[in-house]
Amino acid sequence: MIHKTIEPARAQRAEAAAFIQEHFETAPEYLLILGTGLGQLAEEMTIDTVLPYDEIPHFPVSTVESHAGKLLLGRLGGKPVMAMQGRFHYYEGYSMQQIVFPVRVAKALGVQTLLVSNACGGLNPNFERGDIMLINDHINFLGDNPLMGPN
């Protein structure tokens, strides 16, 4: 039995994916969330389509002034990519399910690889600014988690 709250989320995801799919010829292999440190990567892309978040059904809209709020469809290094200019934060009032909605839409479109950048602190004194990290776990004191409930 499917949990009663998951069906509307799946329908919204399918609607958003269908809308985005109308705007590209080749399914994207990668989703790039252009956060801190990756914003200029958009300048390296061959951009075919720019979709403002507020035009994509059910997509959250970033309230952070420095976030452009656009989904870019194109190529980078010859690979088909989707790139998000701006992401969503818990402190903006979004639920975890809303925050991860674009990632789930990307998966529905066939994306297999997600690249995210962010600014963070670290406890290990051997870490230096600009180090690349692979996150395989985290400490969450928020009391909410994007993996809670049906996935």
Language model segments and positions:
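Metabolite-binding pocket within alpha/beta catalytic cores that recognizes anionic/polar moieties
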Residues: I2-N151
